[in-house]
């Protein structure tokens, strides 16, 4: 018999994402964990949120998680397919930035204490050890939107100084965005990792640990962070509702495209 109390950290991460989404918000997602989280939000926590996808799909309600942004499973359950897909992200972000309703998900290989994200390269830019796919739409999203950043919590990823700034966060603290001509009233709101939730101090704009998973601890988070991190405000999150874990496994991602279910939990 399936054990829905035996959850994985990725499932916890997806549920944590879902709980950050509110009714009335417009949510920009791609695929993977952010999409699973947004799908859970739409089904459970925020049925009146509106999911949009960078390929031009508006107000999506996927039954089963699509594998890519062009997957037909997206198109079967969406309110509108915008033909001008190349510019949709920037047009929508600019419009919704003014309405302050948009929340968007981005990720990367490295992040610094102010939420600047690198998804371009590791090492010297001109002679990199590793070259990634780059910004895609993430730079435009991070410029004009409030963002939730998805990361694996490892010391090599949480760095005091990242190798390249692909997507701007709070730059170097208060006023940093404005000095570069970026909107100062939007920026990274949360970092959701496989260990917990990190937020940004309103005054300093520096990251701090807000909450940690039952499977983690403040000490565990510190051990896997490459810069000084305030953990004094951190609280332990509740374990996810088994009914939501069942929903993820049986309806949203039954093929385990993005979340692998442990054998003992099947």
Curated annotation (Swiss-Prot):
GO biological process terms held by the UniProt record: glutamate catabolic process via 2-hydroxyglutarate
Leading EC class: transferase
GO cellular component annotations of the record: cytoplasm
Gene3D superfamilies for this protein: Glutaconate Coenzyme A-transferase
Catalysed transformations (reactions): trans-glutaconate + acetyl-CoA = (2E)-glutaconyl-CoA + acetate
Predominant subcellular localization, coarse grouping: cytoplasm
Record-annotated active site: 54
Keyword Cell cycle: no
Pathways involved: Amino-acid degradation; L-glutamate degradation via hydroxyglutarate pathway; crotonoyl-CoA from L-glutamate: step 3/5
Record Pfam families: CoA_trans
Record keyword Transferase present: yes
Family, as annotated: Belongs to the 3-oxoacid CoA-transferase subunit B family.
Subunit: Heterooctamer of four A and four B subunits.
Function: Catalyzes the transfer of the CoA moiety from acetyl-CoA to (R)-2-hydroxyglutarate and related compounds like glutaconate.
Protein name as it appears in the record: Glutaconate CoA-transferase subunit B
Organism name: Acidaminococcus fermentans (strain ATCC 25085 / DSM 20731 / CCUG 9996 / CIP 106432 / VR4)
Lineage: Bacteria, Bacillati, Bacillota, Negativicutes, Acidaminococcales
